[in-house]
Amino acid sequence: MSNEYLLYGAKGSGSAAVEAALTERNLPHRVVEAATWLPESALPELRAVNPLQQIPTLVMPDGSVLTESAAILVQLGLHLPAGVLLPADPAHRAQMLRGLVYIPANCYSAISIIDYPERWTDQQDEASLEAVKAGTRKRLHRHWEIFADQFPQRPFLGGDAPGALDILAAVVSRWAGTRKHLQEHRPAFHDLLQQVDSHPSLLPVFRRHWDA
């Protein structure tokens, strides 16, 4: 059995969070470019392990398949020694698990509406679609404000070093104007995200995905 993780993802996508976690912990892995918007990518290979063709999709060393960013990060955190991606303290760990569910449920889901507003209304004219996007973006930014108020840094959300929740927040907050909004309305949390971005163990991955 190989000890290598196989990650299906694409540049600038949510797979960056999983890639960052694997890289930060020096876990052997290989990234395969695959996405429905990249027709020349390894879509058939992705479809074979995940019929939904969603990324990230992670094939574990034992051959089992994991999907959903939060589920993958939780499993990696449980697999590694306590205190690495998830805190060792049970109460702190419970809050990090809460945050890992909060982001997909309240933030990631809103981004999908902003990206594809035509899926969420019968009114297909441009004005109606823009109204859906604007309303959803406002709600998304409010959800991030609530997140910032609920999850204190110590100095990072996960403790002394960036953990799973720090990584996921740093990735998902890059979309839909969230960083600019947080810089104005939650500057301390915005500063935390920048610290995660520039952390030496994560910076190479984020640079690969966002050229910054």
Question: Which residues does each PLM region occupy?
Answer:
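GST-like domain detector, emphasizing the conserved glutathione-binding G-site
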Residues: M1-S128
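Positions that flank functional sites
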Residues: T36-W37, P162, D211
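Active-site-flanking alpha-helical
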Residues: G77, V172-S173, F206
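Residues at helix-coil transition
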Residues: G77-P81, P152, D197-S198
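GST-like fold's C-terminal all-alpha helical module
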Residues: G99, I103-Q195
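Long hydrophobic alpha-helical segments typical of transmembrane helices together
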Residues: A188-A212
